[in-house]
Amino acid sequence: MRFFSYLGLLLAGLASLQGFSTDNPLEEELRCWCLYVKNCRFCWACQDGLCKNKVLKDMPPVQEHSYPMEYCMLHRQCKYITDGPIFQVECTMQTCDAIRLLNA
């Protein structure tokens, strides 16, 4: 019986991800995405070939179409690095949810 409870929770979580697009996340989700996953294209505002992070204002600008800009689009993954491990999250998964899964 417990199995079905877990299965139901898992399916409910997956259903909430349906239709989620990393092309243009909601403004209130940007902070969660971009604090931990700085390499996602939507975290950056670009003008004249230079891009500034929308959330991390103290980050230096990067060139448009550089590695951080294109990683998510090419590999369908967003990536962030901590002192030891490298965490990769599929672009279709909300970062906050992925962090909870990694820490579980």
Curated annotation (Swiss-Prot):
Induction field: Expressed in the early phase of the viral replicative cycle.
Pfam hit, one: v110
Disulfide partners: none
Keyword Mitochondrion: no
Cleavable signal peptide: 1-19
Alphabetical UniProt keywords: Early protein, Signal
Family, as annotated: Belongs to the asfivirus MGF 110 family.
Protein role: Plays a role in virus cell tropism, and may be required for efficient virus replication in macrophages.
UniProt-recorded name of the protein: Protein MGF 110-2L
Taxonomic classification: Viruses, Varidnaviria, Bamfordvirae, Nucleocytoviricota, Pokkesviricetes
